Amino acid sequence: MSEKRNIRDHKRRLLAAKYELRRKLYKAFCKDSDLPSDMRDKLRYKLSKLPRNSSFARVRNRCISTGRPRSVYELFRISRIVFRSLASRGPLMGIKKSSW
């Protein structure tokens, strides 16, 4: 199940990267008050016709091993649960249990 979620998230990331420039241009032109309103409406329509999954708001950071969507460390791309187990076993280089 986690494999399917990660594949779906990867596809969303690829689509978001593909349409990033076009989406930013349309948004900037839509907000430009110097342009005529009919032109801005056309650009707003084009923006709405872009694929829904091409928005970065739909991209979710997921754990690469379990697919868990919550509490994912962005640096390692793993969840806190997997991070704790890997850190205690030792495969994460440079990570050790703190003591003071």
Swiss-Prot record:
What Pfam families does the annotation carry?
Ribosomal_S14
* GO MF: structural constituent of ribosome
Q: Where in the cell is it found?
A: Mitochondrion
Keywords of this entry:
Mitochondrion, Ribonucleoprotein, Ribosomal protein
Which example biological process does GO assign this protein? translation
GO CC annotation: what is one?
small ribosomal subunit
Q: Which InterPro entries match?
A: Ribosomal_uS14, Ribosomal_uS14_CS
Membrane-spanning residues where? none
Q: Which PROSITE patterns match?
A: RIBOSOMAL_S14
The family database entries (PANTHER family) matched by this protein are listed as: 30S RIBOSOMAL PROTEIN S14 (PTHR19836), RIBOSOMAL PROTEIN S14 (PTHR19836:SF30)
Q: What family is reported? A: Belongs to the universal ribosomal protein uS14 family.
Name used for this protein in its record: Small ribosomal subunit protein uS14m
The species this protein was found in:
Vicia faba (Broad bean)
